[in-house]
Amino acid sequence: MTLQQKELFQKSPLLLENGETLSPVLVGYETYGTLSASRDNCILLEHALTGTAHAAKHFEDDAPGWWDDYIGPGKTIDTDKYFLVCTNVFGGCSGTTGPSSINPKTGEPFRLQFPGFSIKDIIKVQRELLEQLGVTRIVSVIGGSMGGMQATEWAIDYADITDSIINIASPLAAGPDAIGYNLIMRMAILNDPDFNGGNYVGQPEGGLATARMVGMMTYRTSELFSKRFERFTVAESSPAAFSKEHFQIESYLQYQGDTFVERFDANSYLYLTKAIDLFDVTAPAKDDLPAFSKIKIPYLLIGITTDQLFRIHDLRRGYELLKEWDVPVTYHEVASEYGHDAFLVEKEVPKFEPLIRSFLSNLPVKSI
């Protein structure tokens, strides 16, 4: 079954963390496997910043998903055993209500009139969807990068129906370097003349492509770039090369930027990167205790030692904090020349798959 959509918050509006409301909210999602009679065999999979709900193929000729190697009969997320749900995040642009959606009050796209939102708001929408789908318990919430932030929020806000968390390459709070990169990317978009205060007709392609290029430099490593590109040049030149020498790394980054603008919305990029910046579960909650101290369910944290976006020292610090507060946390580190995006790379599956499979297989037995 491919992308489905469900309209939520029709009678009672979605109340966001900042006090604003929104109604209705359309959610795009895909499911794999079958919900059990006891409705407690669900795994919720969270995508990263620019991901979609299409996590895996549904049939042989289907478009590849972003986690095909982990999903299917007999695989890590065994669809003969689990009912997997993957949503497009609230505020995104691939099936779920976001800045490019039509504002029912005006008949025009929300654009920058869309309300600000947090990671907590994203999972609130997911919780409503799962309730509508009849899910009563979640075996595990799994996510990498921004998806790991969502998974962590689930452990805090909805531990009553969640049995475990798997967080890959995501800290307990966005660090200053990640926030800085996000600022640079947003400024590239905001300073594009075609952005027009968010009221663009076509994409502000130059700014959005530049933002993507900056992002790609943080998702990979200098080791990988050196091995793949060295100082090699390509035959064709480009105005951006500013000379007849056009380096392969330049061509690669331009390709990444050019293809990205065809599938992603600039306003969504602004909102989602800001939601990442604001994520901080180390901050005191209403009871003056750090929000993460409420986590009482098994929590797998996987850090990537070569990560250029969410640095390994932040993951290690997160692990120490979780231990200090008696969170039942398991921590592993993976080394990879692919850096932050290693968990999305087919070649690196043998490094991650055993950790995830072992964690899931050692959870307390439930009626699944």
From Swiss-Prot:
Single biological process term from Gene Ontology: methionine biosynthetic process
Enzyme class: transferase
Keyword Amino-acid biosynthesis: yes
Subcellular location: Cytoplasm
Transmembrane residue ranges: none
InterPro entries given in the database record: AB_hydrolase_1 (IPR000073), AB_hydrolase_fold (IPR029058), HAT_MetX-like (IPR008220)
Keywords, in A-Z order: Acyltransferase, Amino-acid biosynthesis, Cytoplasm, Methionine biosynthesis, Transferase
Signal peptide: none
Binding site for substrate: 212, 341
Active site residues per record: 145, 307, 340
GO terms for cellular component: cytoplasm
Any GO MF annotation of the entry: homoserine O-acetyltransferase activity
Pfam name, any one: Abhydrolase_1
EC annotation from Swiss-Prot or TrEMBL: 2.3.1.31
Domain AB hydrolase-1 positions: 43-346
Superkingdom, natural source: Bacteria
Record field: catalytic activity: L-homoserine + acetyl-CoA = O-acetyl-L-homoserine + CoA
Annotated family: Belongs to the AB hydrolase superfamily. MetX family.
Subunit structure and binding partners: Homodimer.
Classification via HAMAP family: MetX_acyltransf
Function: Transfers an acetyl group from acetyl-CoA to L-homoserine, forming acetyl-L-homoserine.
Protein name: Homoserine O-acetyltransferase
Species lineage: Bacteria, Bacillati, Bacillota, Bacilli, Bacillales
